Amino acid sequence: MHPKQQRESFRSKQYTGTTSGMCDNYLQANMIILPKEYAFEFLLFCQRNPKSCPIIDVLEEGVTTPQIADADIRTDLPKYRIYRNGQLDKEVTDIKDKWRADFVTFLIGCSFTFEKALIENGIRLLHQEQERVVPMYKTNIPCEKAGRFEGNMVVSMRALEPEEIDKAVKITERFETSHGSPVHIGNPEEIGIKDIDNPDYGESISFDKKKRTPVFWACGVTPQNVGLNVKPPIMIAHAPGHMLITDQLEEK
């Protein structure tokens, strides 16, 4: 399905699930919306932390259509999260009634973009096979501070067979705007993850820990995690795993 048709299914509420595996070859994006007074500091945070926050588009104040998609960012994601004063308020399927003229929207690259390349090279992705939202975890890996924005990186995890890991690294390092190569391979406790079966975002997956190794990529949910520390009066984001599918091909 073309991204435009897929986004229409989100807008009409026909589909509100994860976007993993959808619209092969097209960039998917994490989204953060903040009041203008926070926008410069957040932009600086992203520039200082390109591994977890690779910016692919920034919309001007009040604008709702990005350059990289013929879309309305208020309706064309399957699910959104609304945070108020550092707390999750609710999950919704559109944000039209929450929109403000002073909102600035940031679109950040997503690791879903490189998943097709992994599959084409014979690497199984268990979260897709098990129809789960990819598991994501808070870590002890610090991000570089920018103004009020500071905190630790969030990572996504894919459990791979040992012989697949080198291949996965070489494939994903080409996707710089989609988090690139892994930030950690192996023991999750080394990056502050105490329970691999209990992710902070997304859903757990089942895998044989004797036969598969957890591989972790920087994740665009990092800004949501950091935003909780800043506690803006309102912050809107994609629900983890529920991205904006853009019209931009991954090769560009």
Curated annotation (Swiss-Prot):
Q: Which domain of life is it from?
A: Bacteria
One GO molecular-function entry: lyase activity
Q: Could you tell me which PANTHER family the record lists for this protein?
A: D-GLUTAMATE CYCLASE, MITOCHONDRIAL
Keyword annotations of the record: Lyase
The record's top EC class is lyase
Q: Per the UniProt entry, what species is this protein from, by scientific name?
A: Oceanobacillus iheyensis (strain DSM 14371 / CIP 107618 / JCM 11309 / KCTC 3954 / HTE831)
Q: What are its E.C. numbers?
A: 4.2.1.-
User: What does the similarity note say?
Assistant: Belongs to the D-glutamate cyclase family.
What protein am I looking at?
Putative hydro-lyase OB3382
- Pfam families xrefs: D-Glu_cyclase
Xref: InterPro entries: D-Glu_cyclase, Putative_hydro-lyase, UPF0317
